Regions:
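Structural recognition of the beta-strand scaffold that forms the well-ordered cores
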Residues: 1, 78-83, 110-113, 152, ...
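Extracellular/luminal Protease-associated
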Residues: 1-101, 109, 182
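Metal-dependent peptidase/peptidase-like ectodomains
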Residues: 5, 31, 110, 160, ...
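Soluble non-cytosolic domains of exported or imported proteins
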Residues: 59-67, 112, 116, 180-188, ...
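Short alpha-helical segments and helix-capping/turn motifs at coil-helix boundaries
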Residues: 62-70, 74-75, 138, 150-152, ...
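Soluble metallo-hydrolase cores and metallopeptidase-like ectodomains found primarily
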Residues: 99-180, 192-205
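His/Asp/Glu-rich mid-to-C-terminal helical/loop segments that flank catalytic regions of hydrolases
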Residues: 102-105, 109-113, 120, 195, ...
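Secondary-structure transition/capping motifs at alpha-helix termini
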Residues: 159-161, 196-206, 230-236, 273, ...
């Protein structure tokens, strides 16, 4: 499995039924092939070649998670166990979620198990041994609707209070772990950048918004609401910095030519801010890409779809800690200890410097050449 629950919708049933039907055809062909191959055993190699007869291939069966799911549920199974790669990935019930109500809540536990533990069980089944399995499963359902809340910190601009620079990360995480990286690494950097500017007595000319978004994992819900309801005028946003990836360190940023001089000025302090982490501003080469037409990826998406600049730092594992994002992405290893403290510290510095610098320009960033018009 890839982490998603079993699709028990009508579409899922139809996919499984099609696979079952195809497997019946494969079974028929395999029986014929086995009979043919058996007949060749009584023939000499010379006779086989003379008659042009060779062994037929035994075809593999098609696979699909819980192929006989509907039939097993009707037979009264108590649960499903699937083998999982380690670290175990769990994803939300994307295919079933729109069909769920309090009247048809899931009744069959869908268990993702370490593939090595699964193999022990599978071998016992193959040996036709009797055994019992016990799982302690604690799922709780609550009557909706469930409210989601964005948390927005506001540092009001002294000269251009109705113009904005934003930074953000998302508050929610998958329950399989604590979200220490996804997106604790983003939330903590945004909060620390806010603290640094405030403690330094910063008085930005332009308003800075420190955004902690709700519901990113379930469809960018918080940032989508913010953009679609024009919580602030989108044309007044200079840039939105999104942090939702590994706990790595900013070492450069690439910007359109029209923004290059501004970013060189704003990011100048970062070139010497830390001796271990050089920082460069790069001018984008070539033609701009098209404005995104669909949302995806992270909370920058709806801003970008509406033409708001969402330029972000290039992050690197500069000291070679060998961080692997896919090791933590929606897995049981997405915990606090996977963050890299020194990278987080410097990321906060970079974010604070960039936010404060853009907020203190005498103009919002020029969007010329940001996207292909």
């Amino acid at each position: 499995n890839g982490g998603f629950p079993i699709d028990w919708t009508e579409k899922g049933d139809s996919i499984r039924n099609a696979v079952i039907k195809e497997n019946l055809e494969i079974e028929k062909k395999n029986r014929e092939a086995m009979m043919h191959n058996r007949s060749l055993k009584d023939m000499s190699e010379k006779d086989r070649k003379k008659k042009g007869m060779e062994e037929k291939e035994i075809l593999p069966y098609k696979t699909e998670p819980a192929l006989f799911y509907k039939q097993m549920v009707e037979a009264g199974i108590l649960g499903i166990i699937q083998a999982s790669e380690v670290p175990i990935t769990t994803l939300y019930d994307r295919k079933n979620i729109d069909k769920l109500s309090f009247d048809n809540l899931p009744a069959i536990p869908d268990i993702k198990l370490d593939k090595q533990q699964y193999a022990i069980i599978e071998n016992m089944v193959d040996r036709r041994e009797y055994f019992q399995l016990e799982f302690d499963i604690r799922n709780h359902f609550r009557m909706g609707p469930v409210k989601y809340h964005n948390v927005i910190g506001v540092m009001r601009g002294t000269e251009y209070p109705d113009e904005y620079v934003l930074a953000g990360g998302h508050l929610d995480a998958y329950d399989v772990a604590t979200g220490g990286v996804d997106c604790g690494n983003g939330v903590s950097v945004v909060m620390e950048a806010a603290r640094m500017i405030a403690e330094a007595g910063g008085k930005p000319k332009r308003t800075i918004l420190f955004c902690l978004w709700a519901g990113e994992e379930f469809g960018l819900l918080g940032s989508k609401y913010f953009v679609e309801n024009e919580t602030v005028p989108l044309e007044k946003i200079s840039n939105y910095f999104n942090r939702d990836g590994g706990p790595l360190v900013p070492t450069s940023i690439t910007v359109p030519p029209a923004m290059y001089d501004d970013f060189v000025k704003v990011c100048a302090p970062l070139a010497e801010a830390h001796p271990d982490y050089p920082f460069t501003v790069n001018k984008r080469q070539g033609e701009p890409g098209a404005r995104p037409a669909k949302a995806g990826g992270s909370d920058h998406a709806h801003f970008a779809m509406n033409g708001v600049p969402t330029l972000s730092f290039r992050l690197t594992d500069h000291k070679g800690y060998n961080f692997s994002y896919m090791e933590i992405w929606h897995t049981e290893r997405d915990t606090y200890n996977k963050s890299i403290p020194e990278y987080q510290d410097h990321s906060s510095t970079c974010t604070a410097v960039a936010l404060y610098g853009l907020a203190n320009l005498d103009h919002v960033l020029d969007r010329t050449g940001l996207y292909k018009e």
